[in-house]
């Protein structure tokens, strides 16, 4: 079964996308992920100035995922521009993940990374003071950031949302009102781990963001809620490890899925997920569009 799809203004050969922050620091690594079957790739989040990130340990493994507190380390858009050009040789859409503290900073980064096939606005990182989630919990700021970037670029703009709110729907609606072509749900959940032998928080930043299979039920619910109120596409992310996870996200309303933590276990995840989706559709004699939002239609019958 053909599984080409349209995701937020981009045509993808399959509905799997590399999530921001995983093997997205160099053009070469992004090309490698594309060669392993990803339908599109998202870069590491890039800002206006070089940022070293938080002290180690910055990532720990749990039974059902990871907690990371990288702190948005990046070389700045000026230094990353060459990596983006290399990544564009991959043959798949390359989405630049960008962050800032104000609409003006977001716009400066977008203008400083010309050539991206789309921009993903990181208004959701939970462990970078002054950035990410501190912007993304304010609907008015999300709206103004989205509007500013949309006015500055001629390619699709996606907004990556935080789950660390009481209700994600007003944030999604604010992104839509600002002109977003899609929302991406979700970024990591605020989390922490403590060494019981010393009493010290394990991460250098003390707290971080939880990703992997542990967050999937939360992500599914967020996608489901957003699909009910938005007119723009929803891209699902959070705990996708296999084709069945991807199908579940699509039934909740996602038009495509981003994959992050699972790549640490198997770089071939994109190909296996795509093949699994195709085989599932063949068995069910269905088209990809028919499973998107299916859970909503079933409950209304």
UniProtKB/Swiss-Prot annotation:
Which cofactors does it use? Answer: FMN
Q: Which residues bind FMN?
A: 44-45, 122, 160, 186, 212, 238-239, 260-261
**Residues annotated as the enzyme's active site:** 125
Tell me the keywords, alphabetical order.
Cytoplasm, Flavoprotein, FMN, NAD, Oxidoreductase, Pyrimidine biosynthesis
Q: Which Pfam families match?
A: DHO_dh
Its annotated pathway reads: Pyrimidine metabolism; UMP biosynthesis via de novo pathway; orotate from (S)-dihydroorotate (NAD(+) route): step 1/1
User: Which residues, by range, are in coiled-coil regions?
Assistant: none
Keyword flag Cytoplasm:
yes
Q: How is the cofactor bound?
A: Binds 1 FMN per subunit.
State the compartments where it is located.
Answer: Cytoplasm
Task: Kindly state which reaction or reactions the protein catalyses.
Answer: (S)-dihydroorotate + NAD(+) = orotate + NADH + H(+)
* Record-level Gene Ontology MF annotations: dihydroorotate dehydrogenase (NAD+) activity
User: Which amino acids does the record list as binding substrate?
Assistant: 44, 68-72, 122, 187-188
The family database entries (PROSITE patterns) matched by this protein are listed as: DHODEHASE_2 (PS00912)
Report quaternary structure and partners. Heterotetramer of 2 PyrK and 2 PyrD type B subunits.
Which PANTHER family does the record cross-reference, listed alphabetically?
A: DIHYDROOROTATE DEHYDROGENASE (FUMARATE), DIHYDROOROTATE DEHYDROGENASE (QUINONE), MITOCHONDRIAL-RELATED
Role noted for this protein: Catalyzes the conversion of dihydroorotate to orotate with NAD(+) as electron acceptor.
NCBIfam families, per database record: PRK07259.1 (NF005574), pyrD_sub1_fam (TIGR01037)
Protein name listed in UniProt: Dihydroorotate dehydrogenase B (NAD(+)), catalytic subunit
